[in-house]
Amino acid sequence: IRDSYARFDLKGEKADALRQQLLSAVEQHANITVMTESICNAWFTDHYLPVIQSKRLYKVRAKQCIVASGSFDQPVVFRNNDLPGVILTSAVQRLMKLYAVQPGQKMTILTGNDDGYLAALDFIDAGLNVVALVDMRETAKDAALYGALKAKKIPCYMGSTVYEALHEKHMHRVTGVDVRKIVSEGEVSTESKQIACDVLCMSS
């Protein structure tokens, strides 16, 4: 089972290798039973867990429970952030890798972490058109990721944010973004840079 479709490293090779390594370790462990294609649909008192596999119900009673729900992206608040075309980066990666769906033609990425850079490289490798990356930080934690995007001639707007998602009259989806420099906490510059795009990915 794979819940995350994120890229883990610059070359995009680490995730599959790590997944296979962990799967092998778990499957070979004498005290671990792996139940695939199963659903735990509740968590009752005293750690009673009904687990459904196909047409069979397993009544599991555990001493301890660990819920590994995975990581998640946090959306960014700005004007018109509920327009169609504004989407979490992880959702785009899932659409692309699981369903082979291209969400749009021109993509802008708004990020506050290095995952945004890794996602941009994922999209470029898949043949998608990344027109810009907007980073709310002044510098990327991993300089190599910034360098990789610059080498592919992707404009990177550092220390900036999306002030507003733009749309044309009577067209209720993203047609561009208004990018502004962050000048202090909670305050942005009055000077704006407008970038045409039909998808805005957020990874913060």
Specify the residue positions occupied by each region the protein language model found.
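Residues forming the flavin
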Residues: I1-S204
